[in-house]
């Protein structure tokens, strides 16, 4: 079954999503959450940390593997979702809502895909926001 991809978000080839709001929120796609399996530990950048597009800024550990969290943008982290640190499974349960990871003031963007481009590349299904 194809995983949902929200139409109002943009995506990196590393499976992170970026919202259009300011500051922008970052999370992992349902495609990534499904591939990871049950997320059991999350390491996020701290508020105030500088992140760089295409560079690791944290880790997601699941029952299957440990994966780098790669920032889709360059900027400064302004907020971290402590709820996913306390309850990492929220990423699997609601990757586009309560499972967001951090918010960032964007200085520059990496190579981002539209929802349609991401869905075509990773065999997913675009759904309305």
Language model: regions and residue ranges:
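Short, Lys/Arg- and Gly-enriched loop/turn segments at beta-strand edges
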Residues: 61-70, 87-89
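Charged, amphipathic alpha-helical coiled-coil/dimerization segments
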Residues: 74, 78-79, 85, 92
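Acidic, low-complexity mobile loops and tails
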Residues: 1-56, 89, 93, 97-129
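ATP/adenylate-binding site constellation spanning eukaryotic-like Ser/Thr protein kinases
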Residues: 23, 71-74
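Residue-level recognition of beta-strand microenvironments
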Residues: 18, 63, 80-83
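Charged, alpha-helix-enriched surfaces in structured cytosolic catalytic cores
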Residues: 72, 86, 113
């Amino acid at each position: 079954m194809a995983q949902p991809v929200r139409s109002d978000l943009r995506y990196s080839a590393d499976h992170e999503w970026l919202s259009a709001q300011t500051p922008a929120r970052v999370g992992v796609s349902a495609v990534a959450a499904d591939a990871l399996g049950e997320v059991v530990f999350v390491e996020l950048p701290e508020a105030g940390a500088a992140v760089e597009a295409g560079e690791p800024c944290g880790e997601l550990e699941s029952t299957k593997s440990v994966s780098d969290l790669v920032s889709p943008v360059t900027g400064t982290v302004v907020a971290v979702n402590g709820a996913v640190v306390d309850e990492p499974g929220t990423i699997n349960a609601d990757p586009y809502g309560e499972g967001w990871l951090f918010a960032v003031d964007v200085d520059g963007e990496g190579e981002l895909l539209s929802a349609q481009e991401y869905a075509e590349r990773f065999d997913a299904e675009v759904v309305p926001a």
